[in-house]
Amino acid sequence: MNLEQKSDALYDFTVTSLTDILNAGVDVCMVQVGNEINKGMSGETFMSSVAELLKAGSSAVREVSKAAGKDIQVAVHYTDIDKQGEVAKITADLEKYGVDYDIFAMSYYSFWHGSMENMQDMAEYVQDTYGKKVVIAETSYCYTSEDGDGSGNSVSGDGDLVDGYDATVQGQADMLRDICAAADEADIM
């Protein structure tokens, strides 16, 4: 498929699936277009092309939302928020290419994406510079370093955990509590 065909397919799929979901009685308040799309989306890697896909998805959400008399928010989702330059470039490109969205969704894994203060700084940058809401779309923390499925873990528990947060049930609970508190402090949804 070329870019135009992909954009049309994404638009059609979003209209159909969102309409079906609403018709089933689900109260949808947000639709995320793309998932951790720093490196591209649907085989497209140039930001100008990714922006076309995002605009197609956003347009579909806006159309269905209006027809249903709803206020459904549009989110775009990125990772690697520990790199301020990356967040600045992504948000500048979203603006440059005219992507219509309400929420900048980000993944925050404390063992990969830096301190909670950095997460707050990135959120505040997006909020202050572009007036967008920010949400943490993904996070987690391990409660054990044991391999439970034979596939190998993303985090080994050997030097890659965050100081003060053990790989225990309590360590996981403490981390998630502290992430939620830091997010709340920075007005992150």
Model-identified regions with their sequence ranges:
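Aromatic- and acidic-residue-enriched segments that line the glycan-binding/catalytic groove
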Residues: M1, S48, G150-G157
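Aromatic-lined glycan-binding groove of carbohydrate-active enzymes
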Residues: G98, I103, S115-M116, M122-S151
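Short acidic/His/Gly/Ser-rich catalytic and metal-binding motifs that mark active-site loops
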Residues: M1, K39-S42, Y143-G150
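Active-site cleft segment of glycoside hydrolase catalytic domains centered on the general acid/base Glu
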Residues: N2-Y101, G114-M122, T129
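Short, charged, low-hydrophobicity "junction" segments
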Residues: S107, H113-Q120, A167-Q170
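Conserved, mostly hydrophobic/aromatic
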Residues: V31, G57, F104, E138, ...
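Substrate-binding cleft of secreted/luminal carbohydrate-active enzymes
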Residues: F111, K133-T139, T144-S145, V155-M189
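Catalytic metal-binding/acid-base residues of hydrolase active sites
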Residues: E36-N38, D80, S107-S110, S140-C142
